[in-house]
């Protein structure tokens, strides 16, 4: 090809071809040693290139691994973030303390002053002992011992046990606004609990429930977190060998409580030596021993409305048999200061004693001018009432006091039971029997504190009647079998059988039903009575009069096996119907059978004079 016609590219290819041919020709005449050296140097160059590439690849892999590990750690690794313990315990003020009670973190209702820890009265009531009573009106703390009252005034180092004054080196009760705080050291004199105080932040750890608990030890240094998960903030660092209380299993985590009162979560794999332990504390509970008769109580209430009526005691008792206790209605609270009216009679008591009867005088709160809250929430008023009752009992030779406080409002319940506690001390010291009347237990009367009554009082009496009463919207039995049975069974959940007396009615109600008029239905709209189609009225009748009214009406009596009573009905004027569930020997025998089956302390009855003569033989059969 003519070189003048060749392109640059063609010329470059031709040059390379000639150079390669020249190298090949030269190689035929080259020294063999020189060729070897050249090849060796070429191999070294290739190895260096390969090693550099491998090193670069390794570095790349390491960098990628580190980056991936960092990303994985950020996403899945345990955080070292800590949670603010002041926030955790709810501490917002310098004097506040966090509170953990029985492995539960509570609101920070505790304070510290001068090295003394104080717990709020509300927490004392709920977690330590509800036997401590704070009078917010007169600023007095009270605790009831079997034969003494412990008293401590607010912001004082002094306290009294009955008439003996003692002192502590700390203020016993501190007040901040409406809140009372009680020194834990003082509480521990009378209540069974342990406590420890910790710092940073200040907190108190209390144990008031003793018994079996699950524990485990920490394998290696670890963390307790606010939630189950490695990303949850740390509440507390725990050391190898630390003992934790195990509260709950949560997947791969356990909910635990540390010694310092922190409740949180730790991985199961961090724990070992799980076992059950029993915790206890040496403490002698006060023994509120009272009076227990060595016979079954056979009591009847005697409604006495005037001093003159006391003279009828001989006639009233003439037909009775087997009776051993009588309760005359002698005392009534007359004002909010705790004063009482009394129609007690020494002659009455003397005659009852001659008949072999004890006298347990009744006190009621039926005066509409008396405000139960005002009366019972002031210590001075309660004490005045208690002293007047006991003094009247001693002056008249009375054997016991029967408390019949009815329709106590819910918010007065704590003050009412404190009254019973305080009265029990005076009765115990003066050898007086204390009995307390109660409704059949229902959800709406739990504030009567039957369980505490069962500790403080000698006898707890169930008023096993008024199932249907004067204001009821429908006719029904005064004391059906199931109603009485429920009353006994529910009371026995709270009170020992040897303190329980079941009261039966010597009366019934005669009901009159008439269809409501349009006007009456209109009046009842929006009220509880709206759902009832009949207007009902009733009158209370004693056993004899009730039987007489049925006889006069010519009605047929049939046994109602559901309520276990004889039943009768008849037509009256103006489309009205009369209904009556009779109380008689047949119905009372069933109720007395319940008393016997449950081995109760005895029976009571309302009221003397309403019974027929055959009833006493029946009762005698069950109480003897």
Feature-to-residue mapping (PLM):
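Primary recognition of N-terminal secretory signal peptides and signal-anchoring hydrophobic helices
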Residues: 3-4, 8-9, 15-16, 29-250, ...
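SH3/SH3-like beta-barrel fold
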Residues: 143, 241, 253-258, 266
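Glycan-recognition patch characteristic of GH18 chitinases/ENGases
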Residues: 278-383, 388
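Glycan-binding loop/region signatures in secreted carbohydrate-active enzymes
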Residues: 281, 508-591, 623
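Short, acidic/polar
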Residues: 305-320, 378-394, 442-450, 583-596
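Conserved, mostly hydrophobic/aromatic
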Residues: 326, 403, 460, 502, ...
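Substrate-binding surface in catalytic domains of secreted glycosidases
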Residues: 336-340, 387, 410-546
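Acidic/aromatic/glycine-rich contiguous surface patches that form carbohydrate-binding/processing clefts
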Residues: 587-624
């Amino acid at each position: 090809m003519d070189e003048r016609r060749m392109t640059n590219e063609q010329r470059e290819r031709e040059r390379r071809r000639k150079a390669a041919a020249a190298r090949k020709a030269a190689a035929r005449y080259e020294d063999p040693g020189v060729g070897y050296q050249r090849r060796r140097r070429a191999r070294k160059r290739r190895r260096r290139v390969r090693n550099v590439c491998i090193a670069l690849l390794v570095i790349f892999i390491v960098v990628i691994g580190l980056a991936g590990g960092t990303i994985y750690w950020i996403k899945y690794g345990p955080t070292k973030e800590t949670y603010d313990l002041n926030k955790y315990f709810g501490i917002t003020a310098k004097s506040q303390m966090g509170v953990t009670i029985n492995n539960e973190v509570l609101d920070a209702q505790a304070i510290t002053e001068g090295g003394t820890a104080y717990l709020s009265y509300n927490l004392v009531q709920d977690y330590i002992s509800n036997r401590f009573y704070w009078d917010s009106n007169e600023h007095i703390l009270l605790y009831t011992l079997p034969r003494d009252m412990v008293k401590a005034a607010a912001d004082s180092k002094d306290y009294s046990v009955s008439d003996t004054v003692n002192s502590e080196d700390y203020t016993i009760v501190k007040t901040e606004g409406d809140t009372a705080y009680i020194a834990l050291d003082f509480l521990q004199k009378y209540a069974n609990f342990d406590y420890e105080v910790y710092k940073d932040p200040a907190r108190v750890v209390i144990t008031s429930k003793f018994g079996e608990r699950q524990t485990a030890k920490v394998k290696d240094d670890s963390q307790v977190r606010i939630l189950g998960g490695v990303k949850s903030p740390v509440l507390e660092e725990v050391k190898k060998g630390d003992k934790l209380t195990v509260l709950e299993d949560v997947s791969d985590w356990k909910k635990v409580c540390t010694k310092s009162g922190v409740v949180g979560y730790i991985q199961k794999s961090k724990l070992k030596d799980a076992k059950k332990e029993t915790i206890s504390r040496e403490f002698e509970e006060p023994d509120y021993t009272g009076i227990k008769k060595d016979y079954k109580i056979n009591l009847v209430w005697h409604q006495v409305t005037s001093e003159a009526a006391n003279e009828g005691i001989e006639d009233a008792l003439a037909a009775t048999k087997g009776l051993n206790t009588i309760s005359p209605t002698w005392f009534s609270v007359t004002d909010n200061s705790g004063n009482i009216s009394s129609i007690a009679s020494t002659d009455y008591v003397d005659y009852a004693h001659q008949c072999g009867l004890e006298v347990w005088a009744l006190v009621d709160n039926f005066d509409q001018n008396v405000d139960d809250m005002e009366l019972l929430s002031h210590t001075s008023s309660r004490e005045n009432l208690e002293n007047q009752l006991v003094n009247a009992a001693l002056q008249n030779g009375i054997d016991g006091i029967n408390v019949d406080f009815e329709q106590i409002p819910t918010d007065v319940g704590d003050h009412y039971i404190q009254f019973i506690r305080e009265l029990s001390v005076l009765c115990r010291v003066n050898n007086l029997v204390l009995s307390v009347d109660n409704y059949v237990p229902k959800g709406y009367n739990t504030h009567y504190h039957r369980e505490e009554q069962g500790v403080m009082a000698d006898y707890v009496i169930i008023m096993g009647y008024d199932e249907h009463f004067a204001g009821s919207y429908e006719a029904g039995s005064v004391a059906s079998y199931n109603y009485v049975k429920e009353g006994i069974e529910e009371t026995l959940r709270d009170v020992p059988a040897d303190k329980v007396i079941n009261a039966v009615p010597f009366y019934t109600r005669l009901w009159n039903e008439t269809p409501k008029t349009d006007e009456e239905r209109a009046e009842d709209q929006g009220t509880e009575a709206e759902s009832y189609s009949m207007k009902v009225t009733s009158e209370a009748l004693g056993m004899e009069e009730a039987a007489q009214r049925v006889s006069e009406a010519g009605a047929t009596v049939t046994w109602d096996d559901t309520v276990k009573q004889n039943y009768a009905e008849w037509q009256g004027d103006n489309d009205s119907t009369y209904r009556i569930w009779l109380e008689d020997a047949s119905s009372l025998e069933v109720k007395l059978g319940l008393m016997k089956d449950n081995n109760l302390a005895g029976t009571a009855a309302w009221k003397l004079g309403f019974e027929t003569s055959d009833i006493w033989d029946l009762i005698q059969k069950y109480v003897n």
